[in-house]
Amino acid sequence: FKLAPEEALGAPHFLMMGLNQETNGSYYRWDVSYSVSFPTRWERLKANIDLALHRVLWMGPGDLALHEAKKALVNFNDGTFAWKMDGGERFSISGGPVFPTEHELIWSTALQALWLGVLGGCLLYAFAAADRNSVTLWLCLLGVMAMVMLFECRARYLYANVPIFILAAVLGARSLAARVRGR
């Protein structure tokens, strides 16, 4: 396996893809075809930046805000993190002895409830007393959120950072418990 830097799709490609309205900022085959149609890395970077700016200007502030709201739903509304969806169905664990198909609804509902609890805990953490550690954790959370809101949204990008969200949620719940005990 040999890396080919000249053929790489850089950050502007993923920014451009994150601004496509056709798939609410998710993978879009046309964007990939467009990017790889440029023979050099610099031509590709310039074309991606130009198209990203064109999309922002074409949407305007109102449509851009609506687009980002849709991306927030794509990124944060699924506690299963696009289980069995992201990347096609090349591999499935349902229908086997661990996750029989008839329990899929229960499984996905439980995961959704857990994820909503984690997001709720993060919200509680937002109102916790700030210290040096909390600022560091908030910077991590904001960085992850900015990444998935600016660039292509895929469940795997958020899923890789779930421990950060869980830590913030636990600290948020702990802060709430301390406030309740203090009253």
List the predicted regions and their residue ranges.
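Membrane-proximal stem/loop segments at transmembrane-domain junctions that anchor or position
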Residues: F1-E89
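Membrane-interface anchor segments at the N-terminal boundary of transmembrane helices
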Residues: H67-L137
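Lipid-exposed faces of alpha-helical membrane segments in multi-pass integral membrane proteins
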Residues: G117-G120, L139-M147, N161, A169
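Transmembrane-helix signature of polytopic, lipid-linked glycan biosynthesis machinery
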Residues: Y125, L141-R156
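Membrane-interface junctions at the ends of membrane-embedded or membrane-associated helices
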Residues: F127-V135, A169-R183
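Short, aromatic-rich membrane-interface segments at the entry and exit
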Residues: N133-W138, R156-A160
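Hydrophobic/aromatic-rich transmembrane helices and adjacent perimembrane loops
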Residues: R154-R174
